[in-house]
Amino acid sequence: MSIYTVFMENTATGYSAYVPDLPGCVAAASTLDETRQLIKEAIEFHIEGMRINGEPVPEPTRFVEQIEVSV
């Protein structure tokens, strides 16, 4: 099992998500819950396709931190 960093963004019609360690792996939906489910499925499908094509599957390398600043 691997844990990939997923960036979620608000859009005009809902939410979008992408995985920096898996270029091209994206999802979008009208709700956050649906976007989470779709990006999970997209990651699994993306990795499965890479394995079928004999491509190396990248290990997760990115992480996110939130830093509080007083401005």
Predicted regions and their residues:
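Short, charged, surface-exposed hinge/linker loops at domain edges
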Residues: M1-T5, Q37-V71
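Structural detector for hydrophobic anchor residues on beta-strands
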Residues: Y4, Y15, C25-A27
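Short aromatic-glycine-(Arg/Gly/Cys) micro-motifs in beta-strand/loop hairpins
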Residues: F7-V19
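Active-site micro-motifs of SAM-dependent methyltransferase domains
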Residues: T13, G24, F45
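Short, surface-exposed helix/turn micro-motifs that flank interaction/cofactor sites
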Residues: Y18, R36-Q37
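Proline-centered helix-kink/hinge sites
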Residues: P20-P23, P58
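A short, exposed loop/beta-hairpin motif centered on an aromatic-Gly-Thr core
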Residues: P23-D33
